[in-house]
């Protein structure tokens, strides 16, 4: 009996090695059930969804190149005499950090290219994060249930900014040292504890002997570790919540229309990773960035002219450059408002985008889950707020480079500074009003297209001599896209008296919420969609085409 029972297994033969490994792993990790649940997960297809992937792939490139650079970088401020390959600096005294960075650039095989890739990838990572978050903001992808994922993305952006700052400060060149000096001045402006924080960070009086080693630990361990955890959590929530999608035929809040993870999306993502890596490598090979050998080592008594931080920190410098040099002297102490006030505004500018999802949820009272994205024009108030924030950001970027604007365009630096000061307050208001009006105009245009069709460019002469332009009807897909958005009613305070005729108390918070809700969904904030009756009347021949 045993011989007969074992005969089928002998005829089948031994399973392939890959299958045996998979069976072994499944018996211990349960990968079959995990793969079954996620490998056929559907991802919608839209170019804007690739922005998040640019961030992910740039982060991977940063880690890979960063590991290589750590093998040769010496995070020490000990003074050494340089005897490397770069002749103009031979015999100069400099820190080990600066000398090792020169060695990476000129003596390590491929070192300069890796340095450039690392720096360019960091810039592209932060630019991708910035644009990705703006896409999420303007399309309303932060709404329930994705508020936590929005905060994860916000923290990744902020931590990425500080990781980049600590990274380009490590070479201890004159430009990075100027940035460190800038940071030290901001820290010293903090009342009471500023001096203690500065001494702790630098290990004594600036520049001290410890900040490179401390920044090194923060740059390669602390911040990347936190960012990696946030990134994993961000991706897990993307899988858990399912991907958002733009409105279209067959698309609802309960489904996702697109391609499966395997094999289509995986193949596309793999190719896109190598495309991003290739583009960054080409840019790094032909465009020099941070040429520390041309700047020289840092000296506390020197400063670079035209010194600029990386673009993502430019708005913080703009805050300080345009702030008047006000001071308050009291009881033997000086409060430097010219630095301390910008130091307070800096986190507020960033926090404004972090808390916005919760503010909008409270104002609108909308507690439903949203998986269909908005077109920015259909949320004019939100879009106007976003453009106003961008206006503040870019105005401050101009302020951060006021000296370069002045020298390149032969302008008065004082005129630029005053322009930025005024635009900081006036610009967001003008941008808000203009953006909201543009969105409403686009809504009217969409309504007209639904009712009358698209202009064909064909001019027709009627029998009685009148000239008209022929309009072509939209496809069903286009009609669905232009009319699929929901239009909400503003929140109301309700009756002023209760059921007994007694005047009901209405809190100031309720009144504020009602007014803000009116600004979101009131008559002046959305154009009514065309009704079925209007559409039938036009398309049945009563309208004028």
Curated annotation (Swiss-Prot):
GO terms for cellular component: membrane; plasma membrane. GO terms for molecular function: metal ion binding; ubiquinol-cytochrome-c reductase activity. The keyword rRNA processing does not apply. Pfam families: Cytochrom_B_N_2. Gene3D superfamilies: Cytochrome Bc1 Complex, Chain C. It is an enzyme of class 7 (translocase). Its EC number is 7.1.1.8. It is a multi-pass membrane protein. Keywords: Cell membrane, Electron transport, Heme, Iron, Membrane, Metal-binding, Respiratory chain, Translocase, Transmembrane, Transmembrane helix, Transport. Heme 2 binds at residues 132, 234. The cytochrome bc1 complex is composed of a cytochrome b (QcrB), the Rieske iron-sulfur protein (QcrA) and a diheme cytochrome c (QcrC) subunit. Cytochrome b subunit of the cytochrome bc1 complex, an essential component of the respiratory electron transport chain required for ATP synthesis. The bc1 complex catalyzes the oxidation of ubiquinol and the reduction of cytochrome c in the respiratory chain. The bc1 complex operates through a Q-cycle mechanism that couples electron transfer to generation of the proton gradient that drives ATP synthesis. The cytochrome b subunit contains two ubiquinol reactive sites: the oxidation (QP) site and the reduction (QN) site. Belongs to the cytochrome b family. This is Cytochrome bc1 complex cytochrome b subunit. The lineage of its organism: Bacteria, Bacillati, Actinomycetota, Actinomycetes, Kitasatosporales. The gene is qcrB.
